[in-house]
């Protein structure tokens, strides 16, 4: 509600018979209350006091009314509070990674070709099956320098790690994967 419209309302009502009995000082206190200052303790005429602000930059001009009721206060945080926030963010990221279970690659069985020949209508390429043609999966197990990542980083079993290393080497020989660095499309 605008202060101007409230002041106009109080001026209109001050002409009525109800407000005629009240002293003028009481009407001044009403105006002071609408202006945002503290009302005086007695009805004697006092000058409005300015509010003191310590360390905060509050601006009550009409130009700020378009932003809404947001204030321009900045919080000063201690080092322990900053570290606590950083730790909370790290924990949230770890929880999100735990929720997103990484695809564990599957070593194809020896009778893999027979499975596809028996049921051609169910020929759906499983994204997790390790294959020299599946470059997107193999790129996960190659470091930035082009080296095959160790088991500690890939979190694969020993058998899976050997199979991944063998398929990466065969994909490199066939020209599907680079020897030195990762493909440019991986970074997009």
Swiss-Prot record:
Instruction: Give start-end positions of Polar residues composition bias.
Output: 25-71
Question: Which Gene3D superfamilies does the entry mention?
Answer: Ribosomal protein S18
Keywords for the protein's UniProt record, in alphabetical order: Chloroplast, Plastid, Ribonucleoprotein, Ribosomal protein, RNA-binding, rRNA-binding
Major subcellular site: plastid
Q: Which Pfam families match?
A: Ribosomal_S18
Q: GO biological process: any one?
A: translation
* GO MF terms, alphabetically ordered: small ribosomal subunit rRNA binding; structural constituent of ribosome
Tell me where in or outside the cell this protein is found.
Plastid, Chloroplast
Q: For the region Disordered, give the residue spans.
A: 1-79
Q: Which GO cellular component term is one of those annotated?
A: chloroplast
Instruction: Report which superkingdom the organism of origin falls in.
Output: Eukaryota
Is-annotated flag, keyword Acyltransferase? no
Q: Low complexity bias located where?
A: 1-19
Family membership noted in the UniProt record: Belongs to the bacterial ribosomal protein bS18 family.
Which PANTHER family does this one have?
30S RIBOSOMAL PROTEIN S18, SMALL RIBOSOMAL SUBUNIT PROTEIN BS18M
Subunit and partners: Part of the 30S ribosomal subunit.
Name of the protein in question: Small ribosomal subunit protein bS18c
The species this protein belongs to is Tetradesmus obliquus
Classification from the root reads: Eukaryota, Viridiplantae, Chlorophyta, core chlorophytes, Chlorophyceae
Q: Which gene encodes it?
A: rps18
């Amino acid at each position: 509600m605008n202060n101007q419209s409230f002041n106009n309302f109080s001026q209109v009502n001050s002409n009525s018979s109800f407000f005629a009995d009240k002293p003028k000082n009481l009407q001044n206190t009403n105006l002071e209350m609408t202006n945002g200052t503290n009302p005086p303790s007695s009805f004697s005429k006092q000058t409005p006091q300015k509010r003191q602000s310590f360390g905060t930059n509050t601006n009550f001009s009409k130009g700020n009314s378009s932003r809404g009721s947001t204030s321009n206060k900045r919080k000063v945080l201690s080092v322990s509070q900053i570290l606590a926030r950083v730790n909370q963010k790290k924990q949230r990221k770890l929880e999100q990674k735990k929720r997103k279970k990484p695809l564990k690659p599957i070593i194809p069985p020896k009778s893999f070709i027979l499975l596809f020949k028996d049921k051609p209508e169910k020929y759906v390429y499983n994204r997790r099956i390790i294959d020299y043609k599946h470059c997107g999966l193999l790129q996960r197990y190659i470091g930035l320098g082009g080296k095959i990542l160790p088991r500690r980083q890939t979190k694969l079993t020993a058998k899976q790690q050997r199979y991944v290393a063998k398929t990466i080497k065969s994909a490199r020989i066939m020209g599907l994967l680079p020897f030195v660095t990762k493909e440019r499309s991986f970074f997009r």
